[in-house]
């Protein structure tokens, strides 16, 4: 009986590498090195919201993920999230920051201590910010006290 319980528990939580992603269904397949590269069925990916508020995130192929399987077997499981590792290190180490870094180097960073939101397009061609269907409010002076924007919202030079 104890061996059966150990076997079930050992198969409930597993670490693997994403082998493929179905961007239409929002699922991914995961290969498990400890099982001779056995590949899972399509697994749902845990997200922060899926009802009224919706959060879209899918892991990349070759990303290390943590998976949870139902105790009825390995036919139904879920990807709980990604893991940092020796190869994939933390992008920052600051308890006051929320940080999102994208594959092209672009990042969004909020520092709750300094109340600073930073958006940095590290891509050689720069980037675009698109705001649709919104009224934008902004401070009309720079730190130097000079006008930053004209009423037409064109940057002053």
Predicted regions mapped to residue ranges:
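Conserved hydrophobic positions within beta-strands
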Residues: 17-20, 79
């Amino acid at each position: 009986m104890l061996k059966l319980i150990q076997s079930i528990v050992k198969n409930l939580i597993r670490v693997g590498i994403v082998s493929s992603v179905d961007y239409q269904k929002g699922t991914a397949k995961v290969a498990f090195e400890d099982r001779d590269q056995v590949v899972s069925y399509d697994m749902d990916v845990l997200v922060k919201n899926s009802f009224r508020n919706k959060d879209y995130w899918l892991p990349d192929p070759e990303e290390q993920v943590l998976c949870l399987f139902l105790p009825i077997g390995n036919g139904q499981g879920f990807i709980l999230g990604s893991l940092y590792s020796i190869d994939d290190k933390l992008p920052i180490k600051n308890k006051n920051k929320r940080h999102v870094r994208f594959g092209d180097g672009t990042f969004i960073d909020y520092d709750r201590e300094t109340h600073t939101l930073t958006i940095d397009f590290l891509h050689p061609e720069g980037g675009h910010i698109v705001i649709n269907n919104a009224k934008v409010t902004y401070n009309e002076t720079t730190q130097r006290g000079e006008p930053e924007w004209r009423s037409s919202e064109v940057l002053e030079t």
